[in-house]
């Protein structure tokens, strides 16, 4: 979606070091055991500013992206443990004044946490049951420059950890809070940009066909995983050089549901579902982040809530093909994480 020249555009680079102060909250009564947990952490970001005129024209902003590494004490060392997080982030930024910048920051990555659920040694932790889990975060950032190359930031960020339904129990851990840090730029950034020409946006809707695969357990205490296969037809419409809108029709064959039906002695053996969803995404070079909200139009069993949400990160291999990872959830509980292959039809 973005020109490949984005990868070689003139860049300003820098790093930041920050502290995180957050508080976990219980989404349901069954997650009340985390009440009072206050995860605290340290964070290192390495980033680039995409400040070429072409990218500014496309975004109508200053686009920033990078790698984030974090350490968190999750607030209950004997129950929730500690976590190491590695994520990619992107952040459209906007100048408010000579010294003041705001941005909207989205993270996607992975977390290693050391106190997973164990029926013998740690039965009380229902938030995650595998050491490696998914990490998602969304926040609003503000920056104030104290000199031409240095800025302090205060941000509000919503953090989420979940193993994506690969193993149960998996209530997930949500911990919103504040991030306070110091940012240093190797060269003085120039936020006094202007849009010299309106980028040409292709009016056509890109049409994709996607196949995906996952595997999950049938219940909270099973270790055997059952395959989930799916097919998705989607349309993508550019809003500008960074933002795009999506609409999709998805069909699923869920063998984990079929196994659950057998366990519950339900006579109707139907493992198929179909849903429609729409959402919005960000593009940065060959990497796309997208989130969508959907509803099942065919789900005869009704084991899950009718409404679901999805969060996808994908990488464009070439003009036609892309690969990605997608997290699907019902309300606060992840259903599964799938791997997917996408093909551009037009």
Describe the function of each predicted region:
Residues 1-18, 100, 144, 150, ...:
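Bacterial Sec-dependent N-terminal signal peptides
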Residues 13, 36-42, 61, 80-86, ...:
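Residues that define the transmembrane beta-barrel architecture of outer-membrane proteins
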Residues 13-19, 63-67, 102-106, 152-156, ...:
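Transmembrane beta-strands of outer-membrane beta-barrel proteins
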Residues 21-27, 48, 69-75, 108-116, ...:
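Transmembrane beta-strands of outer-membrane beta-barrel pores
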Residues 24, 44, 174-194, 334-346:
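Outer-membrane beta-barrel "beta-signal"
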Residues 35-38, 73-83, 98, 168, ...:
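Solvent-exposed loop/turn segments connecting transmembrane beta-strands
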Residues 44-48, 88-94, 106-110, 138-144, ...:
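Residues on the lipid-exposed face of transmembrane beta-strands in outer-membrane beta-barrel proteins
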Residues 53-56, 98-102, 144-152, 188-191, ...:
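Repeated loop/turn-to-beta-strand initiation elements of outer-membrane beta-barrel proteins
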């Amino acid at each position: 979606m973005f020109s490949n020249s984005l990868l070689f555009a003139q860049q300003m680079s820098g790093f930041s070091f920050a502290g995180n102060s957050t508080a976990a909250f219980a989404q349901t009564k069954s997650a009340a055991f985390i009440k009072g947990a206050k995860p605290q952490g340290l964070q290192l970001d390495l980033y680039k500013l995409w400040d070429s005129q072409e990218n500014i024209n496309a975004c109508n902003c200053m686009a920033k992206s990078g790698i984030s590494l974090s350490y968190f004490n999750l607030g209950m060392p004997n129950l929730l443990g500690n976590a190491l997080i590695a994520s990619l982030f992107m952040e459209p930024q906007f100048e408010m004044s000579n010294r003041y910048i705001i941005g909207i920051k989205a993270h996607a990555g992975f977390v290693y946490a050391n106190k997973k659920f164990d029926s013998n040694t740690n039965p009380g932790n229902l938030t995650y049951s595998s050491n490696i889990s998914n990490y998602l975060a969304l926040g609003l950032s503000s920056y104030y420059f104290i000199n031409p190359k240095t800025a302090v930031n205060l941000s509000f960020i919503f953090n989420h950890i979940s193993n994506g339904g690969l193993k149960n129990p998996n209530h997930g851990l949500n911990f919103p809070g504040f991030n306070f840090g110091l940012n240093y730029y190797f060269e003085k950034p120039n936020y006094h940009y202007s849009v010299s020409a309106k980028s040409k946006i292709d009016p056509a809707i890109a049409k994709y066909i996607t196949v995906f695969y996952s595997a999950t357990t049938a219940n909270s205490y099973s270790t055997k995983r059952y395959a989930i296969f799916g097919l998705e037809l989607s349309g993508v419409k550019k809003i500008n050089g960074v933002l795009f809108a999506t609409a999709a029709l998805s069909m699923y064959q869920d063998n984990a549901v079929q196994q659950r039906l057998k366990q519950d002695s339900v006579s109707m053996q139907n493992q198929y579902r179909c849903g429609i969803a729409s959402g919005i995404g960000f593009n940065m070079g060959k990497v796309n982040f997208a989130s969508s909200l959907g509803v099942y139009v065919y789900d005869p069993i009704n084991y899950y809530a009718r409404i679901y949400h999805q969060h996808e990160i994908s990488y464009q291999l070439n003009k036609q093909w892309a690969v990605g990872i997608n997290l699907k959830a019902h309300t606060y509980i992840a259903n599964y994480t799938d791997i997917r292959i996408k093909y551009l039809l037009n």
